[in-house]
Amino acid sequence: MGSKVRQQIEAQLKQRILLIDGGMGTMIQGYKLEEQDYRGERFANWHCDLKGNNDLLVLSQPQLIKEIHSAYLEAGADILETNTFNATTIAMADYEMESLSEEINFAAAKLAREVADEWTAKTPDKPRYVAGVLGPTNRTCSISPDVNDPGYRNVSFDELVEAYSESTRALIRGGADLILIETIFDTLNAKACAFAVDSVFEELGVALPVMISGTITDASGRTLSGQTTEAFYNSLRHVRPLSFGLNCALGPDELRPYVEELSRISESFVSAHPNAGLPNAFGEYDLSPEDMAEHVKEWASSGFLNLIGGCCGTTPEHIRQMAQAVEGVTPRALPDLPVACRLSGLEPLTIEKETLFINVGERTNVTGSARFKRLIKEEQYDEALEVARQQVENGAQIIDINMDEGMLDAQACMVRFLNLCASEPEISKVPIMVDSSKWEVIEAGLKCIQGKGIVNSISLKEGKEKFVEQAKLIRRYGAAVIVMAFDEVGQAETRTRKLEICTNAYRILVDEVGFPPEDIIFDPNIFAVATGIDEHNNYAVDFIEAVADIKRDLPHAMISGGVSNVSFSFRGNNYVREAIHAVFLYHCFKNGMDMGIVNAGQLEIYDNVPEKLREAVEDVVLNRRDDATERLLDIAAEYADKGVGKEEDASALEWRTWPVAKRLEHALVKGITEFIVADTEEARVNAVKPLEVIEGPLMDGMNVVGDLFGEGKMFLPQVVKSARVMKQAVAHLEPFINAEKQSGSSNGKILLATVKGDVHDIGKNIVGVVLQCNNYEIIDLGVMVPCEKILKVAIEENVDIIGLSGLITPSLDEMVHVAKEMERLNFDLPLLIGGATTSKAHTAVKIEQNYKNPVVYVNNASRAVGVCSSLLSDERRPAFIEKLDADYERVRDQHNRKKPRTKPVTLEQARANKVAIDWDAYTPPVPAKPGLHIFDDFDVATLRKYIDWTPFFMTWSLVGKYPTIFKHEEVGEEAQRLFHDANELLDRVEREGLLKARGICGLFPAASVGDDIEVYTDESRTEVAKVLRNLRQQTEKPKGFNYCLSDYIAPKESGKQDWVGAFAVTGGIGERELADEYKAQGDDYNAIMIQAVADRLAEAFAEYLHERVRKEIWGYAADENLSNDELIREKYQGIRPAPGYPACPEHTEKGPLWELLNVEENIGMSLTTSYAMYPGASVSGWYFSHPDSRYFAIAQIQDDQLESYADRKGWDRIEAEKWLGPNING
């Protein structure tokens, strides 16, 4: 079954262009069906809405579907598509109809079969065929649905395979002639579908023709998951489909170039079924059948087509007109393309005879890179991604990823890293080489990559049966394969053995498995030379000669190898090692080696190796002398301190001899203030007007800074230093400008403010500096700014844009309020939203819909410039807003469709699953020093030892963990400078008392009552001082507890006398005044630095005080002896959760804490109306001592808990929703 149909269709495709039907959804919409129509009799009492479930109509309205099929066949269609676009179990879950998936697919195929057979009987000379449709599902296997967690997936490859397998079996059983995998927006979904289809074919002993059709989503020419047309083709070419095509998303005008490209590269027949143009403002398709037919006729005449049909907006009349347009037009002839290995990431990589040497990046390999191994072990995935990115930037055309290390879960690490790579276009644009000695790791990796990658590696060492089994699966996954020259006897060391093993493997793969020879890559084993063992001297020669043998005897196979192996004897002397690599590769490449696993950033050019060294290396590599190893060892020491490509540093002050404009640019880029006044004055004297110095060399220099920052070649601390230089230069010129009454032009005026109730502004300040560096005038209203003031100043100053910032969750509601007021008062300014607690989802769902003008979520300082320039550009603004609106609509749609990852439970069920603590067997520790303890003007020197520096670097957008960030190839040097500046400032803080650190803590008798905690006035426990209200996790936890903080305090009825602690600390007394002083001097760098340092001191104080409480004040861990790193990693007993954070997310609970400690009177810290702490550099929270206590996140709560909490707090529902919004709205 299947082969006969394929032969019939192929014969027709060579004679004429065949017609596929048109839009099924379009036709169904024309019937204007209501809910009861979708339900029919059978589903009249279904428990959820069914309107829109078009696939269900094959069961509830089968005659209607048959009518549509019949109309398309009458119009001239040759192939009917089954009405099963959303009929997988995954898509049917939207209607809770997963169990009906198989029945729907079977019924749909059966209906189409009946109609096709009726029409074939009418006109036997024109047989009609049924294509069983497998749609894309509503989930993506290579894209995270959560912008905050790019490694997360809401569907797995295996789940897709299972769903598609069930649908495929039913479609075949129902009578489908072909399988159509269509509207592919995520190629990994399609690879899972193809895997399922092929598996079912093998299972049932059938092989139907397969059609593949992808979707180019917009003018970028890429699928939604980011692939170009050719990359998409390469990824699925292994399916060997009857046809390859494109459908949906675009009309014929927009789709034409991609169909043309596909017709050029596809070895299969080419299909297309475009939409009837692009949707109009009402979502309708306007392209008439006649107009569409004109496009189709031109495509056909240009030789692009073998099959044509319609998608959204098309009707039987469109198909009728198309049939007339292509009648008599010669179909596209299949091209005779050269044999080549066609790989892909987001972009294609085709390796042909003429292709130069392919570099495979080796640094993302835990067995070969100590740094990468450390990053993966420490779960520093952002930095690990940077290693991959650097490999690609340095010229790697493929990256090899290996996680085989004894202390790692290699499979989990491989999946996590590959999923993260998928969200980084600079990395995922190249093909992936999945490298492991463990088959389960390789297979897990193949399930994560949408492109066509390479498996590294398989061999015959475990025998032929295992080798064949793995090879068949690799082919089904759609990957190329590296085959090691290794069999049951062992590794091939000699030239003869290398060819013998490779020839044996080649014949098995090509003749028995059917593996494409161009996808076979042999690694004939590169071994170290110059080891001092005579038997090793010819290893390089054996490899070089085996390359020529394999290329000669095994057509289309390629050669690769781990190049660094050859120089292993000289580890520690990188210069000599790279020279060996250069010489070795030179000779391998001459003999036909195609690719090599190398450090892409450390490849030396053969001709650049010093002649003396090159000759000695060639003697070793080519085994030309008996004493070659000794001669190379003799001269190797001369090169021990050299590095490939290093140059001598120029004189440090050579730039002082440059023209003044270049000196100003250099000072701005390097952040040098030493000569800026003198150089600015020299430029002023030589200028006609002082303003020319600003608008000329100074702005030219800042433009260079902006470009370098935008390209990632400068980092945020450097940009802030550049701004300091600029401000000093402008300050020198201002008196001269004022004397001449000149004023310069800016790119726009932007008002920035931290909203009412919030005191955090480091991020806002950084955005302001970056915008100033790009010639925007900034009006910074500071913190705690009421809505009325923001809008009043915006009008008075005639600003172009308003930017709002906030860190705590109540600030989100204040931002909504500002947006509503702007709408009410008919503002027409763009509104920017930023800050740690903000998100694109909240902006799209909660803010943007309250204001008709642009509302833009800006997630970092580097994006602010591009956003502002687009918003203020008459030319770019319309397209920017159109794209923004579409993006927000998508985000809202995702939010509305989002289902919780975990199943919710009732509050009663959650309470029944509280933390199980045997209170009878536990005696809570009695504090050594109960009551209040005040720490006034605390010693900063003591706190410095407790600083966690990693968040400090994150403040400056330098990602990396302290102290390893100093070794980072890109940001390490800047991090060291930043660290030095921070410590210099801390020295001043100590010497001059610039900042004051104050703190307070207290330990109080307490008992839990349900989810709450009663705190007593004294140890008699007769009078309740405060009740601490808590929330409980409310999701299903089959293997764990539903945590609540009260679980860690002994219940009142237990009779146990327990205690709870409270604390509040600040490192920021005086910080605001000092920052303002720096700003007044034009020194934004130190203004931001003092804020960042104060934040670190506050966190350090919290860490110090908690340690002191554990060891001395409470004293339950008197013998504790932890390093600062262990403190940061929370290796101690007990926790200190903070109100407003995940375990107790509701901010008003700071109120009882403030009252218990009398914080404002004792240490001068206060709370705003939104319960933000002032000074901003402050920390507060609770102390729990129980050894089982742990941190957790409350996440989403249900309505029953919302009402319970409101009742306990004495709130109405509106007030509860205000404070618990993030925990009830998602």
Swiss-Prot record:
EC number per UniProt: 2.1.1.13
Catalysed conversion reaction: (6S)-5-methyl-5,6,7,8-tetrahydrofolate + L-homocysteine = (6S)-5,6,7,8-tetrahydrofolate + L-methionine
Pfam family name, one: Pterin_bind
Highest taxon of the lineage: Bacteria
GO BP: any one term: methylation
Domain B12-binding N-terminal: 651-745
Domain B12-binding residues, every copy: 747-882
TM region(s), chain numbering: none
GO cellular component entries: cytosol
PROSITE patterns in the record: ADOMET_ACTIVATION (PS50974), B12_BINDING (PS51332), B12_BINDING_NTER (PS51337), HCY (PS50970), PTERIN_BINDING (PS50972)
Keywords recorded for this protein, A-Z: Amino-acid biosynthesis, Cobalamin, Cobalt, Metal-binding, Methionine biosynthesis, Methyltransferase, Repeat, S-adenosyl-L-methionine, Transferase, Zinc
Intrachain disulfide bonds: none
Cross-referenced InterPro entries: Cbl-bd_cap, Cobalamin-bd, Cobalamin-bd_sf, Dihydropteroate_synth-like_sf, HCY_dom, HCY_dom_sf, Met_Synthase/Corrinoid, Met_synthase_B12-bd
Pathway(s) served: Amino-acid biosynthesis; L-methionine biosynthesis via de novo pathway; L-methionine from L-homocysteine (MetH route): step 1/1
UniProt remark on cofactor binding: Binds 1 zinc ion per subunit.
Residue span, AdoMet activation domain: 898-1226
Residue positions binding Zn(2+): C248, C311, C312
Enzyme class: transferase
Annotated Hcy-binding domain residues: 6-326
Chain positions recorded as methylcob(III)alamin binding sites: E695, G757, D758, V759, H760, D761, S805, T809, A861
Binding-site residues for S-adenosyl-L-methionine, renumbered to this chain: D948, R1136, Y1191, F1192
Miscellaneous section: L-homocysteine is bound via the zinc atom.
Family statement: Belongs to the vitamin-B12 dependent methionine synthase family.
UniProt domain comment: Modular enzyme with four functionally distinct domains. The isolated Hcy-binding domain catalyzes methyl transfer from free methylcobalamin to homocysteine. The Hcy-binding domain in association with the pterin-binding domain catalyzes the methylation of cob(I)alamin by methyltetrahydrofolate and the methylation of homocysteine. The B12-binding domain binds the cofactor. The AdoMet activation domain binds S-adenosyl-L-methionine. Under aerobic conditions cob(I)alamin can be converted to inactive cob(II)alamin.
Protein name per Swiss-Prot or TrEMBL: Methionine synthase
Species of provenance: Vibrio parahaemolyticus serotype O3:K6 (strain RIMD 2210633)
Gene: metH
